[in-house]
């Protein structure tokens, strides 16, 4: 029999083993679709970003007008920009759902896969932050000022670090130039780390909703999951295109239609919606260094999740108490997101502080405790 080129060619063999003949569990649900959706998001962002970069000028006197020029005068420039801006939102929607799936079904027990995933999240957050600064509107400028200023809370080296980040004594032209360079570079770093993420995943194979070994019951990735992924893609593309074409500025801040002005501070400085939960945690502590540490901890806590797993069962499928706690955490994050968008005044401050406290309590104390309790309940 003639050798199949798909299985013998050095490059095609890799693609075949990752996307065609890959043995996959037969029972993975739609929650396992988000990995491929994230890959599509990344490719879309790189493509639209590349097209935008061709018309963008990274200079404080020209950045705002170059973006306006792209939208007005470039063929379909408005479309490319709207896809890129809203693509970022859908990227975060998918990554949050992907992480939520990992938490619910105990996928974090594949430690290397989980840790590279958290690194991917951090890189994505950095990329989105520097990208938001590029249009050089009011919220771009003041967002950059507020967030970079947080580095000054680091003892001893803080102030030096901030001025080094800025390339001067305030957010100015050097800052914009380096942020553009970083925004161009980081997505390719994300693509590279994604390959590492997948390499680790394919060492063990996918987890599944039951959390038990699926070695005895595998099906080929293609055609089953390749088709399922295309269905998932069309289901994501529908709301994405609806948003980008019908209300492209729904998730943006109106303040960003005003060119950056260092002499006028906007009444409410707030980041894009996907950072609001962390921003609320930052603001809930009335001390600069404390706030910065809480902000960092709100995301870095994900690295600890594998060590806080105390249950004898991997997934939450058959653990109603942990399920309740999980959805409590989701509700808590929604409250934090809402608080992050509100001004710092009563009653929002106290709600934010309570939500921040419960966020860390649920993850660090309640999850391991309930896991241990459920183990004990198995004996009765």
From Swiss-Prot:
A ubiquinone binds at residue 202. One of its GO terms (biological process) is mitochondrial electron transport, ubiquinol to cytochrome c. Binds 2 heme b groups non-covalently. Heme b b566 binds at residues 98, 197. PROSITE patterns: CYTB_CTER (PS51003), CYTB_NTER (PS51002). Pfam families: Cytochrom_B_C, Cytochrome_B. Component of the ubiquinol-cytochrome c reductase complex (complex III or cytochrome b-c1 complex) that is part of the mitochondrial respiratory chain. The b-c1 complex mediates electron transfer from ubiquinol to cytochrome c. Contributes to the generation of a proton gradient across the mitochondrial membrane that is then used for ATP synthesis. The gene is MT-CYB. It is found in: Mitochondrion inner membrane. It is a multi-pass membrane protein. GO terms for cellular component: mitochondrial inner membrane; respiratory chain complex III. Belongs to the cytochrome b family. This is Cytochrome b. The lineage of its organism: Eukaryota, Metazoa, Chordata, Craniata, Vertebrata.
């Amino acid at each position: 029999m003639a050798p199949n080129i798909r299985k013998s060619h050095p490059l095609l063999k890799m693609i075949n083993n990752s996307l065609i003949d890959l043995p996959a569990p037969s029972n993975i649900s739609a929650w396992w679709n988000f990995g491929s959706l994230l890959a599509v998001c990344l490719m879309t962002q790189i493509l639209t970003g590349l097209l935008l970069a061709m018309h963008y000028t990274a200079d404080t006197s020209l950045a705002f007008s170059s973006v306006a020029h792209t939208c007005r005068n470039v063929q379909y420039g408005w479309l490319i920009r709207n896809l890129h801006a809203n693509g970022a939102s859908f990227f975060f929607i998918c990554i949050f759902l992907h992480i939520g799936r990992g938490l619910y079904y105990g996928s974090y027990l594949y430690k290397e896969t989980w840790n590279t995933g958290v690194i991917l999240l951090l890189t994505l957050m950095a990329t989105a932050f520097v990208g938001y600064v590029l249009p050089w509107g009011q919220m771009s400028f003041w967002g950059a000022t507020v967030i970079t200023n947080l580095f000054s809370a680091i003892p001893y080296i803080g102030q030096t670090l901030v001025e080094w980040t800025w390339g001067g004594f305030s957010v100015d032209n050097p800052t914009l130039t380096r942020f553009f360079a970083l925004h161009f570079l980081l997505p390719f770093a994300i693509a590279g780390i994604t390959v590492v993420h997948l390499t680790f995943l394919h060492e063990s194979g996918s987890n599944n909703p039951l959390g038990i070994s699926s070695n005895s019951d595998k099906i080929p990735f293609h055609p089953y999951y390749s088709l399922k992924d295309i269905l998932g893609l069309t289901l994501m593309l529908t709301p994405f295109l609806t948003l980008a074409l019908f209300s492209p500025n729904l998730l943006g801040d109106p303040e960003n239609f005003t060119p950056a002005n260092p002499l006028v501070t906007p009444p409410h400085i707030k980041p894009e919606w996907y950072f609001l939960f962390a921003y609320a945690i930052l603001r809930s502590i009335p001390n600069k260094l404390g706030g910065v540490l809480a902000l960092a901890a709100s995301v870095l806590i994900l690295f600890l999740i594998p060590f806080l797993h105390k249950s004898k069962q991997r997934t939450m499928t058959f653990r109603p108490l942990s399920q309740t706690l999980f959805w409590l955490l989701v509700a808590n994050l929604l409250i934090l997101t809402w608080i992050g968008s509100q001004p710092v005044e009563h009653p929002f401050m106290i709600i934010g502080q309570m939500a921040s406290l419960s966020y860390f309590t649920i993850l660090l104390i309640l999850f391991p405790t309930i896991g241990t309790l459920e183990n004990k309940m198995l004996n009765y």
